[in-house]
């Protein structure tokens, strides 16, 4: 496709601006909840999505850092990732009502259980980041897409948050269908 020069320049300037915003040193920390959420999403990306799909597709399916309704969307399905420490309350915290609204034919919720650890199989955000970069190899476009997405949260994490190690314990996978307990936005009064 041929684009007018103004569009190409405009898109390039926007991309450069986005990168400068992301690369600003603002490593104030992301907090435990976002740290665990990012760990879970990166774990699913590396351990499950890239095991079933080419890494290029797996990275493109990952939209969690973009504050979309679900964390992964592909074809006619979506996947929401929730990560909790073992021993936490069994309830899964949903941060917005839209997270469990189906906009695809199928919606799944994967609940990852983890613990802090220092065993050989324990992984930090840095470890997952490095493993994903390594699996991308020399695909510059995929690497750029991954770096752009991950930097939205990872770029704000402190060194302590990036290096804290967790051990994957188990997961539960649920299909969010008409029998799944949830509240839909259309069910709520306008005042809420």
Predicted feature residues:
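Conserved catalytic cores of phosphodiester-cleaving nucleases, focusing on short active-site segments
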Residues: 48, 72-85
